[in-house]
Amino acid sequence: MNLRPLQDRIIVKRVEEATMTAGGLYIPETAKEKPQQGEVVAVGNGKRGEDGKVYPIDLKVGDKVLFGKYAGSEVKLEGEDFLIMREDDILGVVEK
């Protein structure tokens, strides 16, 4: 992907939702909710403070993150769906 986010924005790829339940039932596309977690694929340089300094983002490429239901803007790049959001939209990082 050839897109570099600016300032405190990050690009996230949603994780794929399962199409079957643990009991073996098929979940149709219309019944699925979009997952609220994903993987960071690109990060900006950071947010510029009032003092003029750039404060780096606490996330790195590859981090698994949780975000709000309405966070970010959906974009399609090279046939794949991504979310562009601000660092403030991230609720937490999933630790391994």
Swiss-Prot record:
GO terms for cellular component: cytoplasm. Heptamer of 7 subunits arranged in a ring. Interacts with the chaperonin GroEL. The gene is groES. The keyword Cytoplasm applies. Belongs to the GroES chaperonin family. Transmembrane segments: none annotated. Together with the chaperonin GroEL, plays an essential role in assisting protein folding. The GroEL-GroES system forms a nano-cage that allows encapsulation of the non-native substrate proteins and provides a physical environment optimized to promote and accelerate protein folding. GroES binds to the apical surface of the GroEL ring, thereby capping the opening of the GroEL channel. It comes from Citrifermentans bemidjiense (strain ATCC BAA-1014 / DSM 16622 / JCM 12645 / Bem) (Geobacter bemidjiensis). This is Co-chaperonin GroES. Keywords: Chaperone, Cytoplasm. GO terms for biological process: chaperone cofactor-dependent protein refolding.
